[in-house]
A protein has these predicted regions:
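Internal intein/HINT superfamily modules and their associated LAGLIDADG
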Residues: 1-185
Length: 185
């Protein structure tokens, strides 16, 4: 029986990642993972900052290790955090994966995109967010008399805020009327 494992190989460095493994990763992320745009307040000036992030939590060490192996094949940097104790006494300890470097998030979205079903729209939105952020050029505001730096001129935030709001709506938990695929736990 052909499992599809030998359909096509994508060579990355010394390792080969098959289409089957990428499709598997995409299926796992479609069901268990999150494509997100996160907003947080900067401490110095109190303004909002936005970042792209891929996250997944699971209790299977084998699954987490396979995901990490695939990510390493593509030079995707992921942070791993193991919960030291379960949330409840009868629960297993969960492991959390976070990918938050823009280049790694972009690679992750690009390799999974062809195989995503439920969260394809989120991956596309995240890629658009990263594209806008990568094209952003800082413009400084200077005092016209002294030439002294007054700060950075905010630009492009309207598009980013719009994408953040769209992603927030898509990732809303428990609202089936807007097509959320997120599970209430």
């Amino acid at each position: 029986m052909d499992t599809g494992e030998n359909v096509k190989d994508i060579t990355m460095g010394n390792q080969q990642v098959t289409i089957t493994r990428i499709a598997w990763l995409s299926g796992i992320w479609d069901g268990e993972g999150t494509f997100g745009i996160y907003r947080y307040r900067r401490t110095k000036d109190g303004k909002w900052s936005y970042c792209a992030r891929l996250t997944l939590s699971n209790t299977s060490e084998e699954m987490i290790q396979e995901i990490i192996d695939i990510f390493r094949s593509f030079d995707i940097t992921a942070n791993i955090w193991r919960n030291p104790k379960p949330r409840k006494y009868n629960h297993k300890k969960e492991v959390h994966i976070t990918v938050d470097r823009s280049e790694s998030v972009k690679k992750g979205c690009e390799i999974m995109l062809p195989y995503l079903v439920a969260k394809k729209n989120r991956a596309i939105l995240l890629l658009e967010f990263i594209r806008i952020r990568s094209e952003y050029k800082r413009k400084v505001d200077r005092d016209p008399v002294t030439g002294r730096l007054k700060g950075v001129i905010e630009q492009g935030y309207e598009d980013i805020i719009h994408l953040y709001e769209q992603m927030k709506d898509l990732n809303q938990v428990g609202t089936l009327d807007i097509g959320s695929s997120e599970t209430t736990r």
